[in-house]
């Protein structure tokens, strides 16, 4: 039963697993929202709305903070690996619990 839940996260279109065991999360980010939240899908990416402006890296910092809380992963284990200046971003999550990750993502 536990093995099946580990495969749930793999089947999400916006989530990929690296050989290293880290996960890549493909996101579409919308800054300047009233609050930070997961907001469904945007094409093949998970949409995240952020309560921060896209200035001076504030939205990127808020994205890491929000994902850390939402996914219960330490901030040091979350890095934006692509799209620092774009709305389409790839976030690398190092050593998450696959069951917890699957339970917290839509």
Residues covered by each model-derived region:
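Contiguous, often N-terminal, cationic amphipathic patches that form binding interfaces
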Residues: 1-64, 70-75, 79-84, 89-106
């Amino acid at each position: 039963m536990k093995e099946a839940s580990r495969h749930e996260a793999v089947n999400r279109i916006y989530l990929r697993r690296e050989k290293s065991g880290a996960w890549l999360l493909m996101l579409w980010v919308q800054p300047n929202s009233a609050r930070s939240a997961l907001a469904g899908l945007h094409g093949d990416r998970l949409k995240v709305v952020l309560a921060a402006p896209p200035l001076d890296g504030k939205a990127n910092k808020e994205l890491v903070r929000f994902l850390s809380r939402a996914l219960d992963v330490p901030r040091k284990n979350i890095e934006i690996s692509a799209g620092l200046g774009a709305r389409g971003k790839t976030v690398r999550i190092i050593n998450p619990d696959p069951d917890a990750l699957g339970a917290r993502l839509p």
